[in-house]
Design a protein with these regions (language model features):
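N-terminal strand-loop element at the rim of the active site
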Residues: 2, 6-69, 230-233
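A conserved mid-protein helix/loop that constitutes part of the nucleotide-sugar donor-binding site
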Residues: 14-22, 191-214, 231-237
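Short His-centered aromatic/hydrophobic patch
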Residues: 88-94
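A conserved, positively charged/aromatic
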Residues: 110-143, 152-153
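Carbohydrate-associated surface elements
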Residues: 147, 164
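A short helix/loop element that forms part of the nucleotide-sugar donor recognition site in Leloir-type
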Residues: 171-186
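Active-site donor-binding acidic/aromatic loop of nucleotide-activated sugar
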Residues: 232, 246-256, 261
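Conserved small/polar residues in nucleotide/adenosyl-binding loops
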Residues: 264-271
Length: 271
C-alpha cells in the first residue's frame, strides 16, 4: 500500500483541510492511505474521521525554523516512519519539513501553495526567505491556482491542482433550503448571503460587514451567515452591533453543511 504523509498545521475545518478530506474520502483506500503530521496538540475537527478512514495523526511541536528541538523532532519522526510521498501544505514554511524528508530519503516531496500572499507581520521576512528555499528541497510544486503558484514559486515550474468538490452536494435542493431557513428562523423570502472563513485578518471580515451594511440599507430583508471561528470574532460581533445589524447577521460557528447555502461571498484578497 502507498502511504502519503500530509504535513499541515492541524486538521480543522478550513479550506485546505477540507480539500484534503474531499480527496481522502474518494480515493481507493485499499491502495492508498493518508497520514497526517500536525503542528498543534489539541484535537481537531477532522481527527475522528481520519482515524475512521484508516489514517494516522502524528503531533509535532509548533513549527519554528530557529528551534533545534523542532528539527530533532522531525528527525526522530522520519527515523521511525517511512513514506513514499510527503506532501506539505505549510505554504512558505514547507521548506523545513521537506528538507528533513529529503535527508531521510523520501523520494517524492511536494510543496503545495494555497494562498497568493502572506500577512505582512513580524514573520513576513522569514517567510519570504523560506519560500525561496522550497525548490531546493521539493521534487514537485503544486498550487491551487496561477496567482498562488506565481507568488510562492516565482519562475519555477509548478502544477496547478484545482481544488475539487463534490458538485452533486451543491445542487439546488428546495427541501434543504427550507430546512436550514426554518432552523435559523429566516423567512423564505429573505435574501441570504453566506461566508465561510476563520475570523482572522486575511479573511477580511470588516470589509464584508461594511459591504453587507450597504446591502442591508437597500434590502432590510437581507441576512448574512458567517460560518467559522477565530480570535477576531469578538471584534466583528462588536462591529455588527455598532452598525445595528445584530438581528441580520448570524454567527454559526463551525458547520459541516456549508453546501446548504446558495450564495457565497469571499472578500479575502488572498483567496
Amino acid at each position: 500500500m502507498l502511504r502519503i504523509l500530509h504535513i499541515v498545521t492541524y486538521m480543522g475545518r478550513g479550506g485546505l483541510e477540507t480539500m484534503i478530506m474531499n480527496y481522502y474520502r474518494n480515493i481507493d483506500r485499499t491502495k492508498i492511505q493518508f497520514d497526517f503530521l500536525v503542528h498543534r496538540q489539541e484535537k481537531a475537527d477532522y481527527d475522528d474521521e481520519i482515524l475512521s478512514l484508516g489514517g494516522h495523526i502524528y503531533h509535532m511541536p509548533m513549527l519554528n525554523p530557529f528551534s533545534k528541538a523542532y528539527f530533532n523532532a522531525l528527525d526522530d519522526f522520519f527515523d521511525n516512519h517511512k513514506y513514499d510521498i510527503v506532501h506539505s501544505h505549510l505554504d512558505c514554511m514547507s521548506a523545513y519539513p521537506l528538507k528533513i524528508a529529503q535527508k531521510h530519503g523520501v523520494k517524492v516531496r511536494i510543496a503545495h501553495s494555497h494562498s497568493k500572499s502572506q500577512d505582512k507581520n513580524l514573520k513576513y521576512p522569514i517567510k519570504l526567505l523560506s519560500k525561496h528555499l522550497i525548490p531546493k528541497y521539493a521534487t514537485h510544486l503544486f498550487s491551487c491556482g496561477k496567482e498562488a503558484g506565481d507568488w510562492m514559486f516565482g519562475g519555477n515550474a509548478y502544477t496547478v491542482l484545482n481544488n475539487a468538490i463534490d458538485a452533486e452536494k451543491y445542487r439546488y435542493d428546495c427541501q434543504i433550503r427550507n430546512q436550514v431557513r426554518d432552523e435559523l428562523k429566516i423567512s423564505k423570502s429573505d435574501f441570504v448571503i453566506g461566508h465561510v472563513g476563520r475570523f482572522n485578518p486575511p479573511k477580511n471580515h470588516p470589509f464584508l460587514i461594511d459591504v453587507f451594511k450597504s446591502v442591508h440599507d437597500k434590502n432590510r430583508n437581507s441576512k448574512l451567515l458567517l460560518v467559522g471561528t477565530g480570535n477576531g470574532q469578538s471584534n466583528i460581533r462588536e462591529k455588527v452591533d455598532n452598525l445595528g445589524l445584530s438581528n441580520s447577521v448570524f454567527f454559526l460557528g463551525n458547520r459541516g453543511d456549508v453546501n446548504s447555502c446558495l450564495l457565497y461571498t469571499s472578500p479575502s484578497p488572498r483567496d
